[in-house]
Amino acid sequence: MKVLVVEPEKEPYVKEINSGLSSLQKEVGGFNEAVYPFEDPVAIICNEEGKLEGLPLNRALRDEDGHVYDIIAGTFLIAGLSEDNFCSLDDTQIEKFSAMYKNPELFMRFGSRTLVIPAEERAMPDKERKSMDMER
């Protein structure tokens, strides 16, 4: 089946995998958990114990207002849903979720709050950095 693989600090990519449990566990590095945060017929398949195992934080899950309600730790997959199982994503789904998770995210903890920063903002060309320093 054709899935989207989303690794920490990387852009998503499409991969063909077997639909069996062992293939899914291999991809996410442990026991898997499926979550269904979208209206689309897709699932996020992630490592059930990713946070407990200290896997790197990957991407935030947001509600319809854009507020973060959870963060996925470790590599996760996005797979299509059939009536009773996971299935291949179609091209429209691949395009939509590739764009949604294109930019890796960084996470910073401040007290009880966690800030989510798109990784693209982290890397600033030297010319821009010098320009900002001169403005101070």
Predicted regions span which residues?
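N-terminal nucleophile
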Residues: M1-K15, S19-P125
